[in-house]
């Protein structure tokens, strides 16, 4: 599936990337999620921006993790309800996330 301008979705992890992420510890995954959530706000932000900033912050602590995996972690956080999304999360350049909005009291 392509976007209107022919953009392909984010590719799956290749073998080397899959091997790298399979070695991440639970603590590293928690740190990655913490940093991703810290980059989010109550206004929608591009997933690519959040991913890029998180990579920059964690490169010294958790090196060689591909951006595609960070985007997968963002999708995971959306599934857990820790982030809200708009757009197709399979296209990190064309999707946005934010922290959950407080639901109004009825």
What are these regions (language model features)?
Residues 78-89:
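A short, conserved structural fragment
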Residues 88-106:
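Short, cationic-aromatic polyanion-contact patches
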Residues 2-6, 42, 46, 105-106:
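Eukaryotic, polar/proline-rich low-complexity intrinsically disordered regions
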Residues 1-33:
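Long, low-complexity, charged/polar intrinsically disordered regions in eukaryotic proteins
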Residues 62-79:
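Short amphipathic alpha-helical interaction segments
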Residues 43-65:
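Short acidic, hydrophobic short linear motifs in intrinsically disordered regions
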Residues 25-46, 57, 75:
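Positively charged, polyanion-binding regions of nucleic-acid-associated proteins
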């Amino acid at each position: 599936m392509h976007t209107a301008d022919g953009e392909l979705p984010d590719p799956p992890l290749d073998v080397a990337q899959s091997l790298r992420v399979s070695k991440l510890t639970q603590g590293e995954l928690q740190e990655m999620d913490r940093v991703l959530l810290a980059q989010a706000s109550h206004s929608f932000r591009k997933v690519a921006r959040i991913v890029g900033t998180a990579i920059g912050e964690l490169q010294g602590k958790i090196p060689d993790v591909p951006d595609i995996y960070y985007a997968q972690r963002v999708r995971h956080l959306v599934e857990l309800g820790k982030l809200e999304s708009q757009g197709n999360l399979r296209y990190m350049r064309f999707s946005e996330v934010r922290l959950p909005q407080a639901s109004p009291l009825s």
